[in-house]
Amino acid sequence: MEDLQLVLFILGAIAIVAVLVHGFWSIRRQQPKSLKDSPMGNFYKQQADKESPPKRVDADGFDADGIGAVRVRKVGESNPHETPPISPYLKQDVKAEPKPLFKHTTSTEIKQEPVPQPDFSLQSPLATEQQRGAKVSRQEPVLNGHVPPLGQSHAAMVAQKALEQEKHAQSTTVPTQTALFDEDAYLENTESEDEYAEETVDEGLDEPRDVLVLHVVAKEGQQLNGAELLPCFLTLNFKYGDMNIFHRHVDNAGNGKVLFSIANMLKPGVFDPDNMEQFSTQGVVFFMTLPCYGDALMNFSIMLNSARQLADDIDAVVLDGQRQPWGEFTKQDYLHRIRANA
């Protein structure tokens, strides 16, 4: 029994050793061999050397293609025989200038004599000399020292005075020109034109016979603020103009004839657009004269709608000319007055 166990142990050890040897041999066989270790490497190298012809090299060490042997040089080492490369910018700058095809041998200068200009002046020679003397004698004032700043109104007054003095000096130095037309005839023509214009204006529109008035007043215990009134006026296409009040024109841009206007209900009845933020009033007045330009009924309808819109925007009340609440009876009365003056 002991002999059988010994035999089995020996056979198992032999089998294990055989398996290990076979594994190492398989791994060794699967690894690729390098070209140096291969016996055929030297053979192929020798064949290549035999087939390739020897390269012909000249005295300087360059072959037929101009390729020389590889040289290893240190960094920073310079060759004294090499020529420095030319910058492309220098190549662009150095260009041969084209020679002119035609060479001018002689040059002729043409001198143009000034042409005397005729004297179209209306003044006599004596007056011209006097005017030149006045211009030469006139000198510009020189301001020395520090000048304190002036206010806008004061500066405007000073500029106006200076302009008047200059005009007066020119009028005294420049003599009277010779008249080329009949002054009396010209004055007669201008007077006749003015009379004709006045007649056409009078014929186009008669004197006002009636005035339609609407009041927009604040509620009891309140006032209308100017900061709120100004944007409302501009929204309703009113434009600040004559008599320092706002007007509604035929054109919404503020051009053409005036249809109706807005004034302050309190005396003096004017507005100051520059100080509307500090302005307050009890109410404003819409008024339209009869007869008016265009359709009177249409103009009154626009004025009534503008008054109602303004009252809605600023929380106010619309009253008639007698400061009574606006109603249907008052509306019929205004329409009757419009038809009577149409």
Curated annotation (Swiss-Prot):
InterPro entries: Cell_div_ZipA (IPR011919), ZipA_FtsZ-bd_C (IPR007449), ZipA_FtsZ-bd_C_sf (IPR036765)
Signal peptide (UniProt feature, chain positions): none
Organism field: Shewanella sp. (strain W3-18-1)
Family affiliation: Belongs to the ZipA family.
Function: Essential cell division protein that stabilizes the FtsZ protofilaments by cross-linking them and that serves as a cytoplasmic membrane anchor for the Z ring. Also required for the recruitment to the septal ring of downstream cell division proteins.
Composition skew (Basic and acidic residues), residue ranges: 47-57
A GO biological process held by the record: division septum assembly
Cytoplasmic compartment spans: 28-342
One GO CC annotation: plasma membrane
Periplasmic side: 1-6
Chief location bin: membrane
Region (Disordered): 33-57
Transmembrane annotation, as ranges: 7-27
Protein name in UniProt: Cell division protein ZipA
Membrane topology: Single-pass type I membrane protein
Assembly description: Interacts with FtsZ via their C-terminal domains.
Keywords from the UniProt entry: Cell cycle, Cell division, Cell inner membrane, Cell membrane, Membrane, Transmembrane, Transmembrane helix
Source organism, top-level taxon: Bacteria
Native organism taxonomy: Bacteria, Pseudomonadati, Pseudomonadota, Gammaproteobacteria, Alteromonadales
Location within or outside the cell: Cell inner membrane
